[in-house]
Amino acid sequence: AKKGEYKKSFKMPLVEYDYEEMHIPNVEYDAEFSLSAKQISEMFSQLSNFGNDIIINCSEEDISLSTNGVSGEMTVDIPIDDISSYSIVEGEKITLTYSLAYINKMCITNKLSTDVDFSLSNDMPMKIRYDLGDDSSIMFFIAPKMND
């Protein structure tokens, strides 16, 4: 061996994992919308400067994202005209609270796809989906925070 180079050897035990395959049930969501992955990543990053939780409100008129904390508060109102695609059950209003840290991590992968799809229903996990093309996608599910 040359000077400054060290011989390294490793021994690692084989690991057997027990696993259970999880089935993702088909859910009819009350609201579904698509936004620019880059824009939503920037919005979530900015929102995380103000609070730990994000409140998502969806109605037939608009979508709003808001948070508040010791640093202040921030609200983003997204007009329906600015959304790539949007559908909501007529008359439905959805208000859900999520951990901003988790959503931020899920939406930081904005280079995977130009748009990100969100699917929501009251008291159901939110689905965040990136279309990778060729019938491939990455989906994240995050449960809403429950009120005590």
Where do the model's predicted regions map?
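Structural preference for solvent-exposed beta-strand-turn elements
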Residues: A1-D148
